[in-house]
Curated annotation (Swiss-Prot):
Listed name of the protein: Putative sheath terminator protein
Top-level taxonomy: Viruses, Duplodnaviria, Heunggongvirae, Uroviricota, Caudoviricetes
GO cellular component: host cell cytoplasm; virus tail
Start and end residues of each stretch annotated as Disordered: 45-67
Record keyword Endoplasmic reticulum present: no
Organism (species): Escherichia phage Mu (Bacteriophage Mu)
């Protein structure tokens, strides 16, 4: 099972119920439909350390070389 929610600005329907995915997230089966939605960026996985901020533009910080 996956706990997923719509990505920011997206509205995604469950293909079985035809209802919109809840903005706070829902448990869905790990099947090809939801895996494709994850890969396309239409939904995001909600983990135990949920971060609601949009991290798409956050780049890893470069480490400075010490001399």
């Amino acid at each position: 099972m996956l706990k997923i929610k719509p990505a920011a600005g997206k509205a995604i329907r469950d293909p079985l119920t035809m209802k919109l995915l809840a903005s706070e997230g829902e448990e869905k089966p790990r099947n090809s439909f939801w895996i494709r939605r994850l890969a396309a960026g239409d939904v995001v996985e909600v983990g135990s350390t949920e971060n609601t901020a949009d991290d798409t533009d956050a780049a890893p910080k470069k480490r400075s070389k010490s001399k």
